[in-house]
Amino acid sequence: PGPCCNDKCVCKEGGCKEGCQCTSCRCSPCEKCSSGCKCANKEECSKTCSKACSCCPT
């Protein structure tokens, strides 16, 4: 299998990181936010951060 598949999947909002070409790649929802967002989780992030947050890769 190619990069970003299954357990090597790189998380991103709504699916997989751009450039990953594995059609079976499905990321589980990320709990923490990156992109300079200091909120504890995606829900807080969407309510209190001025910019949209990206998922952490873990």
Curated annotation (Swiss-Prot):
Is Metal-binding set as a keyword in this record? yes
Which UniProt keyword terms apply here? Metal-binding, Metal-thiolate cluster
Alphabetized InterPro entries for the sequence = Metalthion_crustacean (IPR002045), Metalthion_dom_sf (IPR017854)
Residues annotated as binding a divalent metal cation 1 are C4, C5, C16, C20
Q: Carries keyword Metal-binding?
A: yes
Q: Where is this region: Beta?
A: 1-28
Molecular-function annotations in GO? metal ion binding
Q: Which annotated residues bind a divalent metal cation 3?
A: C11, C16, C25, C27
Q: Family, per the entry?
A: Belongs to the metallothionein superfamily. Type 3 family.
* Role this protein plays: Metallothioneins have a high content of cysteine residues that bind various heavy metals. Class I MTS in marine crustacea are involved in the sequestration of elevated levels of heavy-metal ions.
Q: What is this protein called?
A: Metallothionein-1
Q: Which organism was this protein described from?
A: Scylla serrata
